[in-house]
């Protein structure tokens, strides 16, 4: 299976001037953990994740005053839609991140999350029994 088989092609995008609260609200509404940040004046897209927002709030920053552009994930890795899901998962583990922006010919075409990979590998309706958590 390839990245194109698991990626989400309808991507939540925000601008660098959006507040962290606006980005978080959009992520909650769309039930996603990341938004691609598109800045017409920058060379490529960025990503802001729920983790980036939590870190900012945890550091005492005001989510209504802080902008997305100041809290982008560092060291962004882009994936090709032709990568295998194994390659994508390995890149995520090596880079210690949970989302890959998928580009083709320099154009944003999707985003792939760890959840997307697990969904493909287990099937949309994984039917195996989930063991109960141990008490204690």
Q: What are these model-predicted stretches?
A:
Residues 27-30, 35-51, 92, 100-115:
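A glycine-centered beta-loop-beta connector
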Residues 14-31, 38, 79-96, 103-104, ...:
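The conserved cystathionine-beta-synthase
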């Amino acid at each position: 299976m390839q990245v194109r088989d698991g990626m989400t092609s309808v991507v939540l995008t925000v601008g660098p001037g959006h507040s962290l609260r606006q980005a978080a609200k959009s992520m909650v509404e769309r039930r996603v953990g990341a938004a691609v940040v598109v800045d017409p004046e920058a060379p490529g897209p960025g990503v802001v994740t729920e983790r980036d927002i939590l870190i900012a709030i945890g550091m005492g920053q005001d989510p209504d005053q802080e902008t997305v552009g100041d809290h982008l994930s560092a060291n962004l890795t882009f994936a090709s839609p032709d990568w295998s899901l194994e390659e994508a998962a390995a890149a995520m583990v090596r880079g210690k991140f949970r989302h890959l922006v998928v580009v083709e010919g320099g154009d944003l075409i999707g985003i792939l999350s760890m959840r997307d990979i697990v969904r493909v590998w287990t099937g949309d309706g994984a039917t195996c029994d989930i063991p109960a958590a141990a008490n204690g």
